Amino acid sequence: GEDRFLREINDAVQIPTIRKDFIIDEYMIYEAKLLGASCVLLIAALLDTETIRQYKAICDQLGLSALVEAHDEAEAASALAAGARMVGVNNRNLKDFTVDIHNSTRLRELVPRNVLFVAESGIKTAEDIAELVSAGVNGVLIGETSMRSPDKARMLDELRSRV
């Protein structure tokens, strides 16, 4: 999306927002702060461990949270080695776009319980959320399901019904 969308959303809501983008330069972190984001997404598939560590340090200096996204064991290990306090597991394989929400339940076992754990992508039902919560997931990122829903408020109510 466009940067202005993040600013418009921040002007309209009183809850934290995330810049869910392909952060590939530290400039984008400063830009996220100026746009009003509370958090940025750092994708381990795009960034090596040292870069994640450096970007996370910039986030800390700016008062931003960093959600470090992983899809597999190696990426989760990189996120943790970089000092991530919040790890997101993308259930969508970015190489072939297949989705498996059990990716989150499998990788949850590798992430210490004192690290916030977020399941991302492929979450469609309240039952999906209940299964993830029972596996120790602390939060979910829901994108496509909400974007495709004609009645977003009702869809969110249904998803929250089991949590």
Where are these regions (language model features)?
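Glycine/Thr-rich beta-alpha phosphate-binding loop at enzyme active sites
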Residues: 80-105
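Catalytic cores of alpha/beta
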Residues: 24-36, 72-82, 119, 123-142, ...
